């Protein structure tokens, strides 16, 4: 997460080749836990897009999607009517889903629908949602889909496991970090636009510190930019103060998060924070080095921390998802 996949999708949507020839819809289903909620988020995203159009698509929307129970309100000052969807608007999710797909296919231009955090579908209460969506999408002639997600291993499993409905139904692409040789001139140009400069070594240190993860680098570079005056050059001497400033602002949130964890979960988290990138976390060496209780207690703690998105994992490597939280732990414990 926070590598920039959502920004990349919106960047794609803003390209003339896409913007001029397609209708685009972006829907984030991270907060969904059922088919009803999926249909709600999808319908709401399409409705919001339809509201922006001035070509009578709103009438067409309600003509095709008849099963929605939409709320209407009248502004007492302007007299204008507005409408919105609520979760209660979805009475028959499968019927509404059928109508939504019919609506997308009936548009005057092809549609591109981007579904973010698509891996959540695999955790729905209903067991058949992946198969249902696959069958609907397979029938589309004019609508194309982008599936994005922050849990790489879950996304990979959804599209590359022969047992899964979406097996080989899309081309997979991992979003890697922007290369340093591309990122460095970009940062330098932004400083120069405002009459400032930045040492290449500063950019490289920030890049290495956050493994090229876009969101964290941008926050850190913004802090450094703010602390650099007009006509000045940002140097390595400013790095620690910038990082400390960010961590200090987030101190309350970090303490709150830590207070919600059990003692054993805190122990494991602090051990991984000290390592930065931790390997072999259930090995006798790791357990002994950090004075943890046992391999099984580490395993159960990690299971919870992964589920809460506090830890992230790639193969046998574990690290704290929020780099600033990890730095805060190292400094305070």
Protein language model annotation of sequence segments:
Residues 248, 252-333:
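C-terminal leucine-rich, beta-strand-based interaction scaffolds used for sensing/assembly
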Residues 3, 7-112, 296:
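P-loop NTPase nucleotide-binding core
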Residues 152-170:
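Short regulatory helix/loop adjacent to the ATP-binding pocket of P-loop NTPases
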Residues 83-151, 160:
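Conserved Walker B catalytic segment
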Residues 171-182:
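Conserved AAA+ ATPase "SRH/arginine-finger" region at the nucleotide-binding site
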Residues 6, 213, 322:
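Short, conserved phosphate/pyrophosphate- and ester-handling motifs at nucleotide-, phospho-/glycolipid
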Residues 15, 132, 223, 304:
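Alpha-helical DNA-recognition elements
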Residues 184, 188-252, 263, 315:
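Amphipathic alpha-helical "lid/sensor" segments that cap RecA-like P-loop NTPase cores
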């Amino acid at each position: 997460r926070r590598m920039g996949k959502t920004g990349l999708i919106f960047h794609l949507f803003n390209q003339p080749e896409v913007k001029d020839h397609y209708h685009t819809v972006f829907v984030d289903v991270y907060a969904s836990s059922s088919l009803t909620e999926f249909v709600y988020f999808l319908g709401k995203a399409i409705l919001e897009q339809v509201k922006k159009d001035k070509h009578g698509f709103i009438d067409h929307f309600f003509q095709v999607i008849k099963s929605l129970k939409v709320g209407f309100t009248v502004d007492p000052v302007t007299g204008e009517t507005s409408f919105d969807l609520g979760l209660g608007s979805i009475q028959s999710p499968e019927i509404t889903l059928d109508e939504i797909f019919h609506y997308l296919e009936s548009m005057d231009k092809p549609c591109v629908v981007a579904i973010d955090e698509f891996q959540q579908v695999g955790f729905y209460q209903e067991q058949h949602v992946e198969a249902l969506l696959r069958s609907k999408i397979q029938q589309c002639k004019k609508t194309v889909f982008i599936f994005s997600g922050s849990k790489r291993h879950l996304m990979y499993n959804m599209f590359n496991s022969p047992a899964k409905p979406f097996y080989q139904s899309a081309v997979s692409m991992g979003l890697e970090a922007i290369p340093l040789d591309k990122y460095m001139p970009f940062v330098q140009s932004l400083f120069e636009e405002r009459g400032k400069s930045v040492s290449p070594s500063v950019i490289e240190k920030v890049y290495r510190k956050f493994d090229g993860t876009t969101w964290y680098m941008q926050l850190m570079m913004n802090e450094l930019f703010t602390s650099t005056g007009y006509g000045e050059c940002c140097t390595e001497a400013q790095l620690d103060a910038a990082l400390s400033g960010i961590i200090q602002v987030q101190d309350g949130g970090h303490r709150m998060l830590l207070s919600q964890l059990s003692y054993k979960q805190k122990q494991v988290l602090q051990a991984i924070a000290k390592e930065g990138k931790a390997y072999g976390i259930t090995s006798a060496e790791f357990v002994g080095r950090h004075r943890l209780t046992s391999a099984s207690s580490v395993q159960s703690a990690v299971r919870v921390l992964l589920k809460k998105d506090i830890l992230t994992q790639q193969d046998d490597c574990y690290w704290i998802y929020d780099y600033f939280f990890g730095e805060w732990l190292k400094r305070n414990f």
